[in-house]
């Protein structure tokens, strides 16, 4: 569990440098795949924490009752378990999305000249010309 939430604990610049060196060794620096993997690494702690908290409060007697009434495991998961844990999964996904959208440091390390994401474009706009349109985003 500590390994999964370590990107949340370690300072962002250290995570960015570590992810860059790892992606460079793997040949994924300055690629879309490398950027996506970096966002997955940085968003995973938020999903793990919210889904773990949701599952800790989950009542397993409901799934046992469904199994005792003859429901197969796939049907039990789709009709009972998933609707009950869906708020935690959605909130974890939203946290991961907001973190990914806000992430500039790691993407500045990983993105080459041809890769432009929205945070990099916003950073470039702030650096080159101060525009009030960036405040609205």
Regions inferred by a protein language model and the residue ranges of each:
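Transmembrane alpha-helices
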Residues: 40-41, 47-60, 72-102
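The feature captures the transmembrane alpha-helix scaffold of multi-pass secondary transporters
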Residues: 2, 32-36, 77, 89
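A structural signal for multi-pass alpha-helical bundles of membrane permease subunits
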Residues: 15-26, 50, 94-100, 111, ...
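Membrane-interfacial helix termini and adjacent extracytoplasmic/periplasmic loops
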Residues: 9-42, 74, 110-114
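Hydrophobic/aromatic residues in alpha-helical transmembrane segments
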Residues: 2, 15-19, 47, 93-94, ...
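Interhelical loop and adjacent transmembrane-helix boundary motif
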Residues: 101-136
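Transmembrane-helix boundary motif in ABC transporter permease subunits
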Residues: 1-4, 17, 21-25, 60-63, ...
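Short hydrophobic faces within alpha-helices
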Residues: 6, 61-69, 122, 134
């Amino acid at each position: 569990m500590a390994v999964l939430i370590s990107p949340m604990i370690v300072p962002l610049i250290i995570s960015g440098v570590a992810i860059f060196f790892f992606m460079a060794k793997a040949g994924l620096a300055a690629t879309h795949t490398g950027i996506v993997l970096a966002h997955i690494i940085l968003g995973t702690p938020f999903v793990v924490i919210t889904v773990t908290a949701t599952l800790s409060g989950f009542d397993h007697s409901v799934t046992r009752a469904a199994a005792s009434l003859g429901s197969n495991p796939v049907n039990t998961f789709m009709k009972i378990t998933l609707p009950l844990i869906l708020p935690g999964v959605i909130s974890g996904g939203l946290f991961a999305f907001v973190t990914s959208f806000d992430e500039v440091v790691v993407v500045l390390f990983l993105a080459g000249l041809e890769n432009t994401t929205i945070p990099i474009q916003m950073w470039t706009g702030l650096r080159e010309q101060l525009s009030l349109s960036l405040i609205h985003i």
